Amino acid sequence: MTQTQFQVVILATDKASGNSKLEPIDATIPHSLLPIANRPLISYQLEFLEKAGFETKSEPVIIVVNETSQEKIKQYVSEIYKGKIEVEFFVLKDQLATCEILYRIRDKIRLEYFMVLNANLVLEDTFIRQMADLHRKEESSLTVLLKPPTPKVEQKGKGATETSTKQDKLFTDYIALEEKSQKIVMMEPATEVEEDLNFNKSLLKYFPNVTIYTNLQDTQLYIFSRWVLDLIIEDQKEKYPLFFDIKKHLIPYLLSCQIPNIKRKRALPASAFNQNQTLSQTMSSTTSPFDQFSELNAQKNKTIKCFAHLLKKEGYCMNVNTIKNYQQINRDIAKGDLQYLPNEPKSEKNFFIDPTANVTITQVGPQCVIGTSTTLGAKCSVKFSIIGKHCKIGDGVRIENSIIMDHVIIEDRCVINSSIICNDVYIKSGSSTVGQYLTK
């Protein structure tokens, strides 16, 4: 099914990409270009948009980048990416919050619905189609993609438990859903709750069957109806805007709009109740979309609806926002049983080796990826690992459960285990690297 009514915005500015705990591996590489099974992260996003049927010839995908990363990302899209998705870049010269970014690109968002996703998300295209169908069918103002909990992977090494606990809280939300309709009525980040969670009792009057979850993850993929952009535009014109961050400010406001006659700090635009109007109709009007809000709001407030789309547990979705998740998605794709695959050809023994690599198949175990022009020395052993492009691995090196990026040199008799070795790193002979993240 072609998604002609939806325009996509990818926030690839690193800092605008939500919470991220990938230091130090993203210190010298733009977040959206981090290699996953030897493919840049953004390539997976462009692939799932294409598979989901997004038509981008008239309205391209908008990728928001900052000045420091724009050249590398533009180079990948223009010179290496071979897919059908059309892309338009918007370069930020200063650091802005997510609502401010949407205000800056307001003239580029021209369709009835717009989808905002962070540059760290990889998921199956089926979920996007289902989410888009839900948004249209229910005439939703906001649709949020939520992910059920995944089995925890044991972390090893000093400080693993403490770090994991802090990160679990960082990515935990208190989410209230009306069970029958799957309307989302509250979403509060755990980091914003100091002691007790405040729950608006008026919600129970209109949503009596509500369940509060602490184990659903906000994937930071949102679909908005076009009127929400009108709301942001008018808010940003105020001396003291209310909306800066999509998750912290805009979404709680939209959720509260589902309660009739609630007192609001910002009025809703008239376009909120005529969601099928085109942008040309809105732009050609000589009146503000807020001019007729007072009586209209009182009568039609109930038409504001916000929904959650819950992913099925058997489907694949990963936010690449922690090192643990980064390692996991590399392992997942190297297995070769997802809809996403490395660019290297797959062998009968379930590994992926580029034809230009100087490797003997007895050196490489299953679920490994070996990149372009990489050389393995005599008696090397590679198990459950990713090795990037133009790497030189010496004799007798053992690599297991690790990610080796591009242009890495590892001398003879080294042991690399459960580590990430970033671009251009040089490792001396006889070194042992276990559970480390090495950068140049």
From Swiss-Prot:
Subcellular location: Cytoplasm, Cytosol
Protein's UniProt keywords contain Protein biosynthesis: yes
Gene3D superfamilies cross-referenced by the UniProt entry: Hexapeptide repeat proteins, Spore Coat Polysaccharide Biosynthesis Protein SpsA, Chain A
Gene Ontology BP terms: cytoplasmic translational initiation
Keyword Transit peptide set for record: no
Disulfide bonds: none
GO CC terms, sorted: cytosol; eukaryotic translation initiation factor 2B complex; guanyl-nucleotide exchange factor complex
Pfam families (UniProt xref): LbH_EIF2B, NTP_transferase
Keywords, alphabetical: Cytoplasm, Initiation factor, Protein biosynthesis
Family the UniProt entry places it in: Belongs to the eIF-2B gamma/epsilon subunits family.
Function per UniProt: Acts as a component of the translation initiation factor 2B (eIF2B) complex, which catalyzes the exchange of GDP for GTP on the eukaryotic initiation factor 2 (eIF2) complex gamma subunit. Its guanine nucleotide exchange factor activity is repressed when bound to eIF2 complex phosphorylated on the alpha subunit, thereby limiting the amount of methionyl-initiator methionine tRNA available to the ribosome and consequently global translation is repressed.
The protein, known as: Translation initiation factor eIF2B subunit gamma
Organism name: Dictyostelium discoideum (Social amoeba)
Gene it is expressed from: eif2b3
